[in-house]
Amino acid sequence: MSSKLPSVLSATDEEIQLLLAAQAHIGSKNCDKQMLPYVWKRRADGIHILNIGKTWEKLVFAARIIAAIENPNDVCVISARPYGHRAVLKYAANTGAQAIAGRFTPGSFTNYITRSFKEPRLIVVTDPRVDHQAIREASYVNIPVIAFCDTDAPLKFVDVAIPTNNKSRHSIGLMWWLLAREVLRLRGTIPRTTDGWNVMVDMFFYRDPEEVEKQQQEEAQAKAAAAAGEAAEAPLNEWDVTAAPAAGGINPGLVAAEGGALDWSAEPAAAGPTDWAAEPTGASGWGAEPTGPSGWD
C-alpha cells in the first residue's frame, strides 16, 4: 500500500487492523462517480471495497485542517445519524469543538435570530446524505465542509471527503476516534505513541438505549443480591443475659450464671401498698406568695 504521507504520519499495522476489523473499507452496491477514485475494487456480490490507504490519507489531511484552526470551539461536528450521536459528543468533549447530535435546526448557520445560531469556521459531518441541510447552509455562508463519505454519498458542497463506511456503528465510532486522536497529536496535546491517549475507542461506539437500560437493571439486581447475601451472613446482635434485671423481675441468665436454681412456682416479690391519701413528699409551691414584684403592673 503506497502512501503519499510522511513516515511519521503513515498508518501503522495496528491502525490498519482497526480499520479492517471495524469494516471501514466496506462500501455499498451503489457508487457515485465522484467516489470512484477512492474505490479499490468491486466484489462479486456488487459491494464496492474502499482503499484503506486513501482513507488514512484523507483522515490525516482533515486532522491537519482542524488543527490549523486556532480556536477549537470554531469547529462544529454534526451527526443526524443515530450511530454518530455518541461519537460527535465524545469528539467535542475531547477536542473542545461544538457538537450537534440529532436533528439539525434549519437556519442554525443562516438565521441569526434563532436561538441555535452558530458561526463556525469549519464543520465536520458524519453522512452527507443525512446531514444535507447543514451542508447546504454551510455553502450559503462559505463554511468549509469535511464529511465521512460512503461510496454512494453525494459530494456536492463537500470540500474534504474521507472515504469510509458511514453506516456501521463500529466504523463511525472508530473514524471519529481516529480523527480526535490525530487532531490532539497535531496540537501537541498527547504524544505520538501507542499509549499516549488513554481514551478507549469503545467510548465512541453507539449504545442501544434498551441495552443500556438492561445493563443498569442487571447491575441493580446484582447489587441487591450482594446486599441480601451480606445481610444473611451477618451475625445477629446477642443480648447481654448477665446484665442486672429490671426492678421486680428475674433474669434467668443471671441466675444460671450464679449457679442457682430458678423456682418458677415462687410468687414474685410484691411491692408495698400505695397510700393514695398520703401527702406528697415534695411541696409544689403553688400556693406560696411571690417573693418579688412580677413587673406586670
From Swiss-Prot:
<dbReference type="InterPro" id="IPR018130">
    <property type="entry name" value="Ribosomal_uS2_CS"/>
</dbReference>
<dbReference type="GO" id="GO:0003735">
    <property type="term" value="F:structural constituent of ribosome"/>
</dbReference>
<comment type="similarity">
    <text>Belongs to the universal ribosomal protein uS2 family.</text>
</comment>
<dbReference type="GO" id="GO:0006412">
    <property type="term" value="P:translation"/>
</dbReference>
<protein>
    <recommendedName>
        <fullName>Small ribosomal subunit protein uS2</fullName>
    </recommendedName>
</protein>
<dbReference type="InterPro" id="IPR027498">
    <property type="entry name" value="Ribosomal_uS2_euk"/>
</dbReference>
<comment type="function">
    <text>Required for the assembly and/or stability of the 40S ribosomal subunit. Required for the processing of the 20S rRNA-precursor to mature 18S rRNA in a late step of the maturation of 40S ribosomal subunits.</text>
</comment>
<keyword id="KW-0687">Ribonucleoprotein</keyword>
<dbReference type="InterPro" id="IPR005707">
    <property type="entry name" value="Ribosomal_uS2_euk/arc"/>
</dbReference>
<dbReference type="Pfam" id="PF00318">
    <property type="entry name" value="Ribosomal_S2"/>
</dbReference>
<keyword id="KW-0963">Cytoplasm</keyword>
<comment type="subunit">
    <text>Component of the small ribosomal subunit. Mature ribosomes consist of a small (40S) and a large (60S) subunit. The 40S subunit contains about 33 different proteins and 1 molecule of RNA (18S). The 60S subunit contains about 49 different proteins and 3 molecules of RNA (25S, 5.8S and 5S). Interacts with RPS21.</text>
</comment>
<dbReference type="InterPro" id="IPR032281">
    <property type="entry name" value="Ribosomal_uS2_C"/>
</dbReference>
<dbReference type="GO" id="GO:0022627">
    <property type="term" value="C:cytosolic small ribosomal subunit"/>
</dbReference>
<dbReference type="InterPro" id="IPR023591">
    <property type="entry name" value="Ribosomal_uS2_flav_dom_sf"/>
</dbReference>
<keyword id="KW-0689">Ribosomal protein</keyword>
<dbReference type="Pfam" id="PF16122">
    <property type="entry name" value="40S_SA_C"/>
</dbReference>
<dbReference type="InterPro" id="IPR001865">
    <property type="entry name" value="Ribosomal_uS2"/>
</dbReference>
<dbReference type="GO" id="GO:0000028">
    <property type="term" value="P:ribosomal small subunit assembly"/>
</dbReference>
<feature type="region of interest" description="Disordered">
    <location>
        <begin position="265"/>
        <end position="297"/>
    </location>
</feature>
